[in-house]
Amino acid sequence: MAKVTKASTEEPFQKDFIEVLGAREHNLKDIDIRIPKNQLVVFTGVSGSGKSSLAFDTIYNEGQRRYMESFSAYARQFIGDMERPDVDKITGLSPVISIEQKTTNKNPRSTVGTVTEIYDFLRLLYARVAEAYSYNTGKKMVKFSEEEIVQNIFEKYDGKKISVLAPLIRGRKGHYRELFEDVRKKGYLKVRVDGEVMDLKPKMQVDRYKIHDIELVVDRLAVADDMKLRLSQSVQKTLQLGKDLMFLLIQDDGKLVQYSKQLMCEETGISYEEPSPNAFSFNSPYGACPTCRGLGNVYTIDIDTVLPDTSLSVNEGAIVPLGEERDASVFKQVEDFARKNKINLNKPVKELTAQQLNLILYGDKGINPALELDMSDESIPDFYTGSYEGIIPMLKRWFSSGNSSDMLRGWVEKFMVLSTCSTCNGTRLKKESLWFKIDKWNIADLGNLNLDNLAAWFDGLELRMSDKQNAIAKDILKEIRERLQFLLNVGLTYLSLNRPSKSLSGGESQRIRLATQIGSQLQGITYVLDEPSIGLHQRDNQRLIAALQHLRDIGNSVIVVEHDKDIMLASDYLVDIGPRAGKHGGEIVAKGPPENILHSNSETAQYLLGKKSIAVPKVRRKGNGKFIELKGVQGNNLQDIDVKFPLGKLILITGVSGSGKSTLINETLYPLLSKYCYNSKAVPLAYKSIKGLEHIDKVIEIDQSPIGRTPRSNPATYCGFFTEIRTLFASVPEAKIRGYKPGRFSFNVKSGRCDVCEGGGMRVIEMNFLPDVHVHCEKCNGKRYNRETLEIRYKGKSISDVLDMTVDEAVEFFQPVPFIYRKIKVLQDVGLGYITLGQSAVTLSGGEAQRVKLSTELGKKDTGKTFYILDEPTTGLHFQDIKHLLDVIDKLVDRGNTVLVIEHNMDVIKVADHIIDIGPEGGDGGGRILFEGQPEDLIKVKESFTAKYLQAEFK
């Protein structure tokens, strides 16, 4: 038999490397690279150079594709074939897990506690070892077994005559004739009604309109040793009849003693069910607050929105929900009701009496004025009975009714505000659940603690619990402590378990997933991370680096796309991709251990060595001498602070993660400015006063939220220049001959778009129980338009070709067309030269979306009195890109505007005109203003962590 030998051309399998050969995804230029396994590998380079194309679109996607191929043919038919990355070969690839920064959970029920599963273990802990307290008296609840009840009776009432009573009715009206007859037929002789023992008689009944307490006398006996068996049997029978509750009437003094197999308050008689983990879940009907259903907040009518101008009369439109149609059925109700009650609807609302206004707004069902309405009018609802409901009850009913359309509910929502639920005070849980405590703390109290304080509470908890509690809680505590420690290790000390997931930044949610992965203790995995340092102060970087190294040390390959200097230098292997963005990038500029990279000529090496840097300005702007002054800010952890914002300057808000920066700016200052400039409904957190608002006329917050929620949204449509491009194509001679208007070139209009994908370029395949899959349209091949539309060309390019151009290419292409060129040039100026004009909004990172918004604002005319707020605009930016961004920000400030930036990046902090440093720590250890002034003076502040790291920039 012939021996089969391996072909000589085949290379042996590389166990120590992930080898990528011929990668051409997006702008990658047929690159080959060997990435060492089980090491911390950092991909860096300018924005758009191809880092994510290699890490996510090639390595991660190929890993996912191979995983899908391991499914059965039956399972794969529901998923479809994943497109293979444009690469010749990848070897040495282990299972891949991606931890990205743009996938945040928008579910209002999702919290840090539920995502990390710490809250699940906390619920289990409270269900098993918490002690119950009465919400009436605050005293500990008691419960007894049958044996304990008998033993207790003998200990306390030995030798006394007692009656054993089973409660049948507690605090209810009725004559109870049938109940009395039923127990009489069973052989019982006496009952106790409202405290009085009486004989059971035929046809016995009580006053049906009074509230009654009725107990059945099950047995009467003297407590003695020879009565032990009889007492045990009576107790057992009584508990059955009384549904685990019984009373003991001591005949000597008439004292009534209560016993229960359930948790019970000895003084008031209230009882709780035995707790299960669901009793502490706000996502379960067994634990959720019945008012807000576990959300912690409720929609309430905002009277200021319903009645914004009291100088108007009702007929002049004072009550906004009534609208402008005076012949509408609801307005007829108001008119007829007002006429019957002699309310003048032509009088200004402020001149009406409080009673008259309340009648109009809230109705008075007691009046029932028998309104003279034509009930044949189809616009009048069937349930209208003739009494006047009132504007506000009507709005509430429309909002809460299951029969209301989404459109109606959305309209009513305009007149409502989200406020904290008054029943549970925002804790989300029902009253009983909050009275189960461990060491005097309920589960909501623990959920509100910062994670570092929560970890401290768990330290030494065993010393504060009984031996029995410790035996039960041992394994649960181990799980909670481990998960908490992982979160602390990635710098999330300032978060709380109750923090909603939707309020987390991309960086925070990514670090939570990183902590979860560390907790899973998986080995042999290739992790791909996207800028985990986002939102992290320099002080916390070492914690993050240690977490990444721990992930590596337990036997995983860690690939990180990152721009942070500390993480680059801490890596085992650094890959610099470039040299520039888009078609000018996509090459491996340098690779190897960080110390080797420093000797290369790459742009990254120049910045790491300090040969290139962002210069400290020689002169800082003096501003316009005007201020916005905010006093007594107390939201979240802010400690009643006063702060001044000088106008006409670049202001930096600095401080460690969780110190209170977002609370001050995003949750207090911005809502106040927005309310002043646009009369918005945003509600600021607690403050005492604000001055200087008259010095601004616009406020613009440029955050990292997506520029669109669907694949149809793109930079060209968002920035507004696509309309002008369509107009340009409509002016081409061939288009004029065919009679094409600008609408023909819109992928949202039927006439010009592809009729299969309806202008999306992609078709959505619904997968029922799996996520929808997007595939290229087979008719237009992703071009969005039909053949006739694509035949129209401007300078040899179709409308689809233009959408596929990068910003850099479009700047060159449209240079002769000033009104288009100017708007596209601004996108290039903010460092987005590499993205395409038609790139789907859902593929843009948070940082890219923010810079698209920034470019849109730059393209608008301003009055020089605009207040801009930017939250971490350096996200996703290389050193070189930050320089471009600062040039753009300088242009805004030089026009007289104010730009306020929340930032951790020292390159931005050092060029500020004015710094406000908050701290010193995160959470409860922060919330104070440590410094206000210029960067040179900040470095003298000893308790500021920002100052410590800023010193190096001034050496």
Report the location of each language-model feature.
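Conserved phosphate-binding elements of NTP-dependent enzyme cores
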Residues: M1-K955
